[in-house]
């Protein structure tokens, strides 16, 4: 692998100008290293998996030699290799990921960054130092693209274009919809007795066609799907068990497409919980569109009229396990969350997660009691009336004040005019 690297060395000396040393170029050819003949204070060799740093003890070029104990490498302060005091260099040899080095991926290179630190300390009982503290940034750059073989490419009977493939991530989403399913619901508020219209989708792009399923869903008073209390809405790999009670919750048949699944849930709130809101977390997954639905991949609703389960698609017997509560090997349970995503926008109330499967949290769904709404409306009129009365009161006070001022000036004028009449 051809390696390219780069070293930026800047030493800021107290009371002096900044010294910058260019990086020497080291090339590994035939297992031998060749460096520039000019003496550099710091030499760096970026190898395939390691970093070799050689530091001259005359680091500042002043003739004052530094001590090896005052040199460390990286945020983790790795110490140099053991050397003889008579040697005029100090060496470090560490792995690229060692000593707290950081890695950055650019469009054309992998960049490993660290630094060499010279932190002089007093010797013995002395309280003085004779060299400066210096921090020298170090970078190793490795190209991300290149020909790793010097041999010519041998042709095959398959065109090269047939060996190229693309892998695209899947994007899952769970949204709260209006009753007509045509638009996303603008407000998260509900009244008890309403139904929440939920739409799960998977966006495949150029991926092969997939069929989406809601594996399980749970409602909690907080975004944490492991919170208590909780209520299970979908369980056993696609059984909408919330419809077993007095609710009419069900999957919508037929589905708009293989990549979309719609279902309704009769809204509720947890008893003795003053928050009057819930969050719904659903585990979404997808299978190839040509694969037949089975007990592990299904969407089943309960019909109270026939007292039986029925699927959105596929054979009817795949829903029989919903009554037994055992539909094969359990997937991610409520106590073992996979990935939780919450709404990031208050208006749209949805978040997308990119993976092969996803746990999506939608919420909060806020419930308004109808009696509470009536009380709010009743209180709205007195509030407006109080504003009106306040305005009338201020007007009366202003008029009374003006009348009092006029009377005071009138009396003063009459009092001032009486002595004049007496003198006449």
Swiss-Prot record:
Annotated keywords: Cell membrane, Cleavage on pair of basic residues, Disulfide bond, Extracellular matrix, Fertilization, Glycoprotein, Membrane, Pyrrolidone carboxylic acid, Receptor, Secreted, Signal, Transmembrane, Transmembrane helix
Localization in the cell: Cell membrane
GO molecular function, one term: structural constituent of egg coat
GO cellular component: collagen-containing extracellular matrix; egg coat; extracellular space; plasma membrane
Cytoplasmic membrane side: 409-424
Annotated ranges, domain ZP: 45-307
Tissue specificity field: Expressed in oocytes.
Transmembrane segments: 388-408
Residue list for modification Pyrrolidone carboxylic acid: 23
Modifications after synthesis and translation: Proteolytically cleaved before the transmembrane segment to yield the secreted ectodomain incorporated in the zona pellucida. N-glycosylated.
Similarity-based family: Belongs to the ZP domain family. ZPC subfamily.
Chain's role: Component of the zona pellucida, an extracellular matrix surrounding oocytes which mediates sperm binding, induction of the acrosome reaction and prevents post-fertilization polyspermy. The zona pellucida is composed of 3 to 4 glycoproteins, ZP1, ZP2, ZP3, and ZP4. ZP3 is essential for sperm binding and zona matrix formation.
Protein name: Zona pellucida sperm-binding protein 3
Gene: ZP3
């Amino acid at each position: 692998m051809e390696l390219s690297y780069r070293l930026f060395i800047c030493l800021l000396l107290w009371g002096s100008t900044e010294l910058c040393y260019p990086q020497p170029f080291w090339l590994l050819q035939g297992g031998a290293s060749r460096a520039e003949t000019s003496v550099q204070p710091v030499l760096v060799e970026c190898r395939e998996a390691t970093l070799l740093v050689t530091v001259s003890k005359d680091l500042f070029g002043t003739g004052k030699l530094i001590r090896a104990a005052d040199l460390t490498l990286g945020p983790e302060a790795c110490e140099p290799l053991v050397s003889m005091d008579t040697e005029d260099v100090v060496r470090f040899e560490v792995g690229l990921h060692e000593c707290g080095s950081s890695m950055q991926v650019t469009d054309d290179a992998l960049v490993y960054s660290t630094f060499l630190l010279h932190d002089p300390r007093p010797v013995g009982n002395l309280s003085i130092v004779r060299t400066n503290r210096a921090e020298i940034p170090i970078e190793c750059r490795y190209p991300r693209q290149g020909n790793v073989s010097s041999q010519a490419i041998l042709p095959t009977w398959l065109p090269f274009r047939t060996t190229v493939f693309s892998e695209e991530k899947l994007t899952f989403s769970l949204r709260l919809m209006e009753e007509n399913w045509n638009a996303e619901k603008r407000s998260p508020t509900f009244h008890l007795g309403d139904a929440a219209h939920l739409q799960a989708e998977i966006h495949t792009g150029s991926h092969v066609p997939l069929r989406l399923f809601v594996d399980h869903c749970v409602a909690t008073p907080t975004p944490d799907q492991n919170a208590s209390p909780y209520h299970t809405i979908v369980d056993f790999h696609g059984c909408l068990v919330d419809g077993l009670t007095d609710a009419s919750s069900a999957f919508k048949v037929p589905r708009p497409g293989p990549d979309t699944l719609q279902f309704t849930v009769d809204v509720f709130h947890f008893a003795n919980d003053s928050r009057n809101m819930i969050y719904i977390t659903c585990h979404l997954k997808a299978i190839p569109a040509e694969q037949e639905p089975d007990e592990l991949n299904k969407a089943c609703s309960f019909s109270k009229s026939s007292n039986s389960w029925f699927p959105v698609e596929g054979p009817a017997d795949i829903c029989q396990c919903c009554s037994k509560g055992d539909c094969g090997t359990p997937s991610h349970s409520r106590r073992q969350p996979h990935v939780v995503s919450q709404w990031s926008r208050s208006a749209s109330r949805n978040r997308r997660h990119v993976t092969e499967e996803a746990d999506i949290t939608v919420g909060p769904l806020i419930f308004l009691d109808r009696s509470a709404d009536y009380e709010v409306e009743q209180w709205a009129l007195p509030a407006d009336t109080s504003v009106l009365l306040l305005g009338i009161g201020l007007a009366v006070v202003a008029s009374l004040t003006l009348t009092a001022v006029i009377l005071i000036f009138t009396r003063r004028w009459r009092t001032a005019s009486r002595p004049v009449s007496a003198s006449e």
